[in-house]
From Swiss-Prot:
Annotated TM spans: 52-72, 104-124, 131-151, 186-206
Extracellular side: 73-103, 152-185
An annotated GO cellular component: plasma membrane
PANTHER family (alphabetical): CASP-LIKE PROTEIN 1U1 (PTHR36488:SF8)
Oligomer and partners: Homodimer and heterodimers.
Protein known as: CASP-like protein 1E1
UniProt organism field: Oryza sativa subsp. japonica (Rice)
Family per record: Belongs to the Casparian strip membrane proteins (CASP) family.
InterPro entries recorded: CASP/CASPL, CASP_dom, CASPL
Main location: membrane
Keyword Transmembrane helix appears in the UniProt entry: yes
Membrane topology: Multi-pass membrane protein
Length: 215
């Protein structure tokens, strides 16, 4: 009479069958009848790269500084306007420059504030494995926001610094010198933060690539 034999199962059931755990993509070979090793405490949390944390903090502080400096940028001064008559004294007119007068600067402040809020949320979720991919996608969006905001603000700043002779737009930074200097300082800090976000995104992709069990 034919003796019955246990068929090897996926979880190690069956007489003398080798167990194979499919909890990971590579699998874990346990040998005949061997028990699976217990998961170490905290093994569900992804490894934290100190460089990524430092870059994230820099992006957080850089976007905060850029948004605050630009949002607080304001200057009031007086300009002289020549009167119609040659012998009449020039008129002194008070004028004010504010970041809200430029849609490019408004977009710059809003974009930096959004990236700051995202960076704070990403730091809070740094130990969550389920947040790795959403944070990576968010970094991509944040980087695009920062570079576009920097480009818009820098273009408007250069227009105020140099003017445009083709359309007869006069430069205004000779009148609003401190205003332009603070605005360009905020743009430079945001540009550095954007490059830091780019490096952070590349490190995150490299970390996921190394940790993936397909490679």
């Amino acid at each position: 009479m034919e003796s019955s034999r246990g068929k090897p199962g996926l979880n190690g059931s069956g007489g003398g069958a080798a167990a194979f755990d499919y909890s990971s993509r590579r699998g874990y070979y346990t040998g005949a009848g061997a028990a699976l090793p217990p998961l170490a405490a905290g093994s569900r949390a992804p490894p934290v790269d100190p460089c990524c944390v430092v870059l994230r903090v820099f992006v957080l502080l850089g976007t905060l500084a850029s948004a605050v400096v630009m949002a607080a940028d304001r200057q009031s001064t007086t300009v002289q306007i020549a009167a119609g008559e040659e012998l009449a004294p020039p008129l002194r007119v008070p004028v004010t420059a504010k970041w809200t007068y430029s849609s490019a600067f408004v977009y710059f402040v809003v974009a930096n504030a959004m990236v700051f809020a995202f960076s704070a949320a990403a730091l809070a979720a740094v130990r969550r494995r389920s947040a790795v991919v959403p944070v990576m996608v968010g970094d991509l969006v944040a980087m695009a926001l920062l570079f576009s905001a920097v480009g818009a603000a820098a273009q408007f700043g250069l227009l105020g610094e140099r003017g445009n002779a083709h359309v007869r737009w006069a430069k205004v930074c000779d009148v609003y010198g401190p205003f332009c200097e603070r605005a360009m300082a905020a743009v430079v800090v945001a540009l550095i933060a954007a490059f830091a976000d780019l490096v952070l995104l590349m490190l995150t992709i490299l970390t996921i690539h190394k940790a993936s069990s397909y490679y």
